[in-house]
Amino acid sequence: MSVSLVRRVIIALSIAAFGSGMSMRIMDPMLVQLSLDFAIPLGMASWTITVFGVAYGFAQLIFGPLGDRYGKVKIVAWGCCACSLAALFCGITTEFTGLLIARIFAGITAASIIPLAMAWIGDVVVYEHRQSVLAKFLIGQILGLSTGVFLGGFSVDFFHWRLPFFFICVWFAAISAYLGLVIQRLPKSTHIIQLGEGVGLSRTVGEFRQVLNVAWSKQVLLTVTLEGAAVFGALAFIPAHLHTVHNVSLFSSGAFVVLFGLGGLAFAFRSRFWVSRFGEVGLIRTGALLMCTALLSLAWIPFWWWLMPACFLFGLGFYMMHNTLQINATQMAPERRGAAVAAFASCFFMGQSLGVAINGSLFSVVGTPVLLSCSGLLLLIVGSRFAQLRQLRITH
C-alpha cells in the first residue's frame, strides 16, 4: 500500500475524530444555559456530559472486538453515519430527558471512531514512528475539542444552543460517505481481522481477558482512568468557573478553553521534538507538572489575563501525558490491538464520567477553586507514579 494512501486514510480518520471531539465537549459551555432553559440545577445539567462519557466507555467493549473481527475502518465509517443521526436527535429534542437519551446515543456511536482509528494506525505504522503519527492524527480530535467548546459558547450567547448539533450532523454524514469510498481502495493487507475463540459474548470476554492478563495493561488502564477523571472533571467546569468567579461571558469562557486545544496543537505539531527531548518518562512527568500548575493557577490567581497561558499549559501538559499513555496502549496486547485500545478508551471515558459526576455533585458545596485544585494535585500524583513505573520497565 502506498504511503500517500495511508496518509489520506489517516487524514480522513482525523477529520472523523474532529467530529467526535466536537460531540464530546459541545455541552461544556452550555451547562448554565441548560440549567436556565430546563429549570434544573447546574449539577443536573452536567449529566449531559456524564451520560455521554458512560455510554462511550461501555460501548468500547463492543466496538473494539467488532473492529478486530470486521475491519476497523469499516466500523468507523458506519459509526460516523450513526453519529450523524445522534447529533440530529440532540438538536430536535424538546425535553431534558430526551436530550439525555440522545446524548447516550451520541456517546455510543462516537465510541466507534478514535480508538479504532488509533488501533488501525497501530496495525499499519511501525512502533518507532507510531507516537508522532498518532500525535498528528490527534490534531483532528484536539481541534474538535476546542471547536466544540467554542461553538457551544458562541451559539449560546448569540444564537441557540441547539444550532451546533445540526452542524455536527452534516459533518459526520459527509465523512461517513468519504470513508465509504476510501475503504474500497484499501488493499486486503490493511484489513487486519483477528478472530477470537468462541462465539458472541464469550469471544468478546476472552479478547478482553487476554488484554488484562498482561500485568502492564492494568497499570496503563488504571492511570488513564484517573487521568480522565482529573482532567475532564476539571475541564467541564472551567467555563462555569470563569463565568461565576471572573464574570466572563459564556462565549468568552468557551474561547478561553480553546487555548487548551492550542496547547495540544503545540505538542502535536512538534511531537518529534518533544519525544526526542523528553522521552516517554519525561513527557509523563512534565505533562503532569504542567497540568497541576495550570489548574492551581486557574483556581487561585485572581488576574483574568493569567487564564490564557494557564489554559494553554493545561492542554500542552495533558497531551504530553495522554499521548504517551496512548502509545503504551497500542502495544499492550498487539495480537488484540482493537480490544486493547478499546479497553484503554473505555477506562478513559469512564474516568471522565466519574470525574464530571463527582465534581457536579460537589460544585455547589465546595466551589470550583477547590475542585480544580484537587484535580491538579491528583494529576501530579498519578503522573509521577506512572513515570516511575515506566522508568522501571525500561531499565528492566
Language-model segments: which ranges?
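C-terminal transmembrane helical hairpin of 12-TM major facilitator-type secondary transporters
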Residues: 281-325
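Helix-loop-helix hairpin linking two adjacent transmembrane segments in secondary transporters
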Residues: 98, 126-127, 136-183
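Helix-breaking motifs and short loop linkers at transmembrane-helix boundaries and internal kinks
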Residues: 39, 71, 92-98, 109, ...
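Paired small-residue
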Residues: 82, 86, 97-105, 305-313
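Juxtamembrane intracellular "pre-TM" segments in multi-pass secondary transporters
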Residues: 2, 184-220
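Cytoplasmic helix-loop-helix junction between adjacent transmembrane helices
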Residues: 102-140
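Conserved MFS/SLC helix-loop-helix module at the cytosolic interface between two early adjacent transmembrane helices
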Residues: 58-94
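Helix-to-loop junctions at the C-terminal end of transmembrane segments
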Residues: 60-71, 267-279, 363
